């Protein structure tokens, strides 16, 4: 039995004073020795925390004693250690943002909820568009079979992508999904206000689908990206596959790294060997960037040799 747990949760509910709430909530979390990242806004709370089984159970009881969160659903993962290094509780304007001029309130308008078994049926329906509401790098390490991959790097870019592809989506039955459900609550609501009539969402997100006893994560390929030190977790209990591809050579890969150029910081899939070979950088420009955090530890001679090994030159060698 694992000694730790990771809790993923959210709740759209009114929090009148997010700043005061955040300060008091941070103190409570630290007292329970939790670590994680929590966002609070007048529209609700969105969090992931890790801690011992005892501490996380205590936290769930603590939240249940607040009427605003009494029915909040926690997605629980067993863990061997903390999934975060620190504890942060931050007040925000929104707990998830689509950068809309007029925000959508999921308590007033949202897509129809599909339970995991209903969602699996939708996956098998050729007349249904399954739309991934996550970022491109999340999709690349794992997604539902046949799902559409929006070319976005941030959730707030999604409405623009929809408008650019409105013709292909018009009059279609749309079912959307995300990690735990919070993004889809707002996104599906926006779709309805934007003129799409038949809009549904996976209730509880991928995390719930993967733990469902009936679906067991079937028809999910790869792993699910998570925003903590685990990076990705398994979902498909039936016939797991690897869909991630190494950024450098296209071989199967589920290992994410960040480009060592802090001004880029792009997330890419790369093996340990290719991380070393390509100096943990996504491009030549990033490899030779003066702020590169990987190459700054190399001598000038080694840096030059490593570049030459991949048929590249350092800036001073270019005439």
Curated annotation (Swiss-Prot):
Q: Which SUPFAM superfamilies match?
A: Rhodanese/Cell cycle control phosphatase (SSF52821)
Q: Which domain of life is it from?
A: Bacteria
Q: Which GO terms describe its biological process?
A: tRNA modification
Tell me which EC number(s) this protein carries.
Answer: 1.14.-.-
Question: Pfam families this protein is in?
Answer: Rhodanese, Rhodanese_C, UPF0176_N
Q: Which reaction does it catalyse?
A: uridine(34) in tRNA + AH2 + O2 = 5-hydroxyuridine(34) in tRNA + A + H2O
Q: What class of enzyme is it?
A: oxidoreductase
Q: Which UniProt keywords apply?
A: Oxidoreductase, tRNA processing
Supply the Gene3D superfamilies for this chain.
Answer: 3.30.70.100, Rhodanese-like domain
**Which gene name does the record give?**
trhO
- Stated family: Belongs to the TrhO family.
- Could you state a single Gene Ontology molecular function term? oxidoreductase activity, acting on paired donors, with incorporation or reduction of molecular oxygen
Q: Where is the active site?
A: 178
Q: What role is this protein assigned?
A: Catalyzes oxygen-dependent 5-hydroxyuridine (ho5U) modification at position 34 in tRNAs.
**The name this protein goes by in its record:** tRNA uridine(34) hydroxylase
Q: Which residues form the Rhodanese domain?
A: 124-218
Task: Return the NCBIfam families for the record.
Answer: PRK00142.1-3
Q: Where are the transmembrane segments?
A: none
């Amino acid at each position: 039995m694992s000694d730790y747990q990771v809790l993923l949760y959210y709740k759209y509910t009114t929090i009148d004073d997010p700043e005061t709430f955040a300060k008091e909530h941070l103190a409570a979390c630290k007292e329970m020795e939790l670590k994680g990242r929590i966002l609070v806004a007048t529209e609700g709370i969105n969090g992931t925390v890790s801690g011992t089984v005892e501490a996380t159970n205590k936290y769930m009881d603590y939240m249940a004693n607040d009427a605003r969160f009494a029915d909040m659903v926690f997605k629980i993962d067993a863990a061997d250690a903390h999934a975060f290094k620190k504890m942060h509780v931050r007040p925000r304007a929104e707990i998830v943002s689509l950068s809309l001029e007029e925000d959508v309130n999921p308590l007033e308008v949202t897509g129809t909820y599909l339970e995991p078994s209903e969602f699996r049926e939708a996956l098998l329906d050729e007349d249904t568009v399954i739309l991934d509401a996550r970022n491109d790098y999340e999709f690349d390490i794992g997604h539902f079979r046949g799902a559409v991959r929006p070319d976005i790097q941030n959730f707030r870019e999604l409405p623009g992508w929809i408008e650019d592809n409105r013709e292909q989506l018009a009059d279609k039955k749309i079912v959307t999904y995300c990690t735990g459900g919070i993004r889809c609550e707002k996104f599906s609501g926006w779709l309805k206000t934007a003129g799409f009539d038949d809009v549904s969402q996976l209730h509880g997100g991928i995390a719930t689908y993967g733990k469902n006893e009936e679906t067991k994560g079937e028809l999910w390929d790869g792993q699910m990206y998570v925003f903590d030190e685990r990076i990705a977790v398994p979902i498909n209990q039936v016939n797991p596959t690897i869909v991630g591809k190494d950024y450098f050579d296209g071989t199967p890969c589920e290992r994410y790294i960040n480009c060592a150029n802090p001004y880029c910081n792009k997330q890419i899939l790369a093996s340990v060997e290719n991380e070393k070979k390509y100096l943990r950088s996504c491009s030549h420009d990033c490899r030779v960037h003066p702020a590169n955090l990987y190459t700054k530890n190399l001598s000038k001679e080694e840096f030059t040799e490593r570049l030459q090994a991949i048929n590249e030159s350092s800036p001073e060698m270019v005439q």
